[in-house]
From Swiss-Prot:
The gene is cynS. GO terms for biological process: cyanate metabolic process. Pfam families: Cyanate_lyase, CYNS_N. Belongs to the cyanase family. This is Cyanate hydratase. The keyword Lyase applies. Keywords: Lyase. The lineage of its organism: Bacteria, Bacillati, Actinomycetota, Actinomycetes, Mycobacteriales. GO terms for molecular function: cyanate hydratase activity; DNA binding. The keyword Iron does not apply. It catalyses: cyanate + hydrogencarbonate + 3 H(+) = NH4(+) + 2 CO2.
Length: 155
């Protein structure tokens, strides 16, 4: 059955196995020597996991070996529903980009020129920062600047 499993079904198995075994996302990331958020995102179906690393994770999670090629296959990225997210944590990122997205775009254009921040040549990090009024969540997006290049196909 697992060989015919979809990536979404495998993701559900990963979440259940991780909880059942009492593993943290950090422990899984450490097992393969990859960053925490990359590993978590990959295990949630957003990045392909090289087979040699997939084998380590499958073993650690107690999953069938036939999960390895499913993990290694290029995923359908951005698989979140297109509606406004309802999960409170994810919604706060949506809300923050509604409030600050325009300003971020303007300042990127002012400091870098006309272009975008890559989400392909990209990393993300999360840190916990102690604060007297309550711990802070510090999220860092680190993406390569990609200038728009308007080129005619006839050139």
């Amino acid at each position: 059955m697992l060989g015919r499993m979809t990536r979404n079904q495998l993701t559900e198995q990963i979440v259940v196995a991780r909880l059942a075994k009492g593993l943290t996302w950090q422990e899984l990331a450490d097992a393969i020597g990859r960053p925490l958020l990359w590993t978590t995102s990959a295990l949630l179906g957003q990045h392909p996991i090289p087979a040699e690393l997939g084998r380590i994770l499958v073993d650690k999670l107690g999953l069938d070996e036939s999960a390895v090629p499913v993990l290694a296959a290029p995923p359908m990225r951005g698989g979140l529903p297109t509606a406004v997210p309802t999960d409170p944590t994810i919604y706060r990122f949506y809300e923050a980009l509604q409030v600050y997205g325009g300003a971020l775009k303007e300042v990127i254009a002012e400091q870098f020129g006309d272009g975008i921040m890559s989400a392909i040549n990209f990393s993300v990090d999360l840190q916990k920062k102690p604060h007297p009024s309550g711990d802070r969540v510090v999220v860092t997006f680190d993406g390569k600047f990609l200038p728009y290049q308007w080129v005619s196909s006839e050139q």
